[in-house]
């Protein structure tokens, strides 16, 4: 997708502060340091649309971004950062689950996984929420440039087994080389704008 406009809309914590449900949304989520900000920036063709926090796990806001005036990308807070304050860790679950349960224009969630790691309890909890609320997941494996082709294949199989999915459902991505950008966009558009056209 050619991104002409990518703009920050607003940050929110509670539903009353969310933007109006005027555009289809796709949300991005993953553990802290998984490469979520880098993925969104590459998709948007911007170097710093989403700023990477120097203190992972501290910012607990849902950030909304307008893409070309036709789609909203939503940056959900990262999870699993051990040094995050207890009150921050405690509020993460209810805030994210509330967003997933109540957001009527949410079309899909990009669940981002580090290809070098087996999915965490937080990853599995997130997948469980997506299944509960019937939200289509898009699985993206980041940091693929850090492994050899053989290692990537091995890790992809292990992760697919852990989340009980076909390995072909897992998309490979590298922020360094931008490999995988088009494949991620293709899946995002299939579940968002293509759905909107079917509704018309």
Swiss-Prot record:
Pfam families cross-referenced by the UniProt entry: MMR_HSR1 (PF01926)
Binding site for Mg(2+): 37, 59
Binding site for GTP: 30-37, 57-61, 75-78, 142-145, 173-175
GO molecular function: GTP binding; metal ion binding
Domain of life of the source: Bacteria
Keywords assigned by UniProt, alphabetized: Cell cycle, Cell division, GTP-binding, Magnesium, Metal-binding, Nucleotide-binding, Septation
Domain EngB-type G: 22-194
GO BP, sorted A to Z: division septum assembly
Cofactor(s) for this UniProt protein: Mg(2+)
GO cellular component, one term: cytosol
KW Chloroplast (keyword) present: no
Keyword check for Transcription: no
Function: Necessary for normal cell division and for the maintenance of normal septation.
Protein name as catalogued: Probable GTP-binding protein EngB
Species annotation: Pelobacter propionicus (strain DSM 2379 / NBRC 103807 / OttBd1)
Gene symbol of the encoding locus: engB
